[in-house]
Amino acid sequence: MESSKSPSEVEKSSSASPAPQKPMIRVSKQWVVPPRPKPGRKPALDALGRRKAPIKPRPGPTSALSVEEAKFRVREKQYQDTIGKLQKENNELLEQLEMLQAQLKNSTLDSPKEVEVNSEVVKPDSATTENENRYVNQYNYPVEPPCAKNAVYTEIPIELDPHAFLGDSAKRIRVDSDSKDAKSVPSENGRIRVSMSPQNEINFTPENPAVMEKIRKRGVCNSVEGCLYSGSPKSVKRVRESEETKVYAQLLIDLHKSSKSAPMLKAGPSIAFKLPTMEPNFNDVRPVTSISSSS
């Protein structure tokens, strides 16, 4: 009976005799079976991988300070680099400035001799300078024209400019409606003076010395082209003209219009003007008596 024992009984008897062993976890090829959790608790799983989420340590105050210090050091290094570059450029510019100052001193010391030599060798051409002066005088006008005391010259027609005053040679114009024949008498300076009658004298010369001083300084001003022969701009307000000046200007304008509208009278056939010839005319030669016969 003892020999006929089942193998299960033999195993039980053999296993009961040694020390108890820990249970072993069998590993499969595809997955690992985790141990059974304690009752009443759920494991912290990640929603994406269905695995346990790792717990990251929170950054403490020491780590934040270390990051700020690293950034500050980087910025400080950049600033130091830029300061070094600027100092280097400043030194180079100072050296260039010293070199240029030395060259300028040398050139100022040597320039008077060169100028004297060049002035002796090179001489301006008189013909070219005359042509240039002629061209400049043709298109440039003086600020104060060289004229008589009471003479003012303008480029505007005198009948349209109420501020234009005649000079010493033509101070007065006499107008007489009764006289028909007018005689023109040449004046000393070459201008024509019309003398008809002592009645209705019109004096175009300002007698006020203050007005003459303003004319000399500012020139003749009008509303069309500003102040002629003066450096004052157009925005400067000109002096108000008196009532006499307005009357004189209107009279001149009326005279000009009436001269244009007057009919032209034909006095006869026109005489062609011929230049005088220098050839001798033998018809006008008079006989000359000899001295011997008279004696």
From Swiss-Prot:
Region of interest called Disordered, as start-end residue ranges on this chain: 1-69, 108-130
Top-level lineage group: Eukaryota
Keyword Transcription regulation part of the UniProt annotation: yes
Motif Nuclear export signal per UniProt: ranges: 93-100
Alphabetized GO MF terms: transcription corepressor activity
Keywords for this protein: Coiled coil, Cytoplasm, Cytoskeleton, Nucleus, Transcription, Transcription regulation
UniProt main location, coarse: cytoplasm
Gene Ontology biological-process entries: intracellular iron ion homeostasis; negative regulation of transcription by RNA polymerase II
Compartment annotation: Cytoplasm; Nucleus; Cytoplasm, Cytoskeleton, Spindle pole
Coiled coil spans: 73-111
GO CC terms, sorted: CCAAT-binding factor complex; cytoplasm; cytosol; mitotic spindle; nucleus; spindle pole
Stated induction or repression of this protein's expression: Expressed is under the control of the iton-regulatory transcription factor fep1. Expression is repressed under iron-replete conditions and induced under conditions of iron starvation.
Residue ranges with Low complexity bias: 1-19
Subunit structure: Component of tha CCAAT-binding complex composed of at least php2, php3, php4 and php5. Interacts with crm1 and grx4.
Protein purpose: Component of the transcription regulatory CCAAT-binding complex. Required for the reprogramming of the cell for iron use. Down-regulates pcl1, sdh4, and isa1 underlow-iron conditions.
Protein name: CCAAT-binding factor complex subunit php4
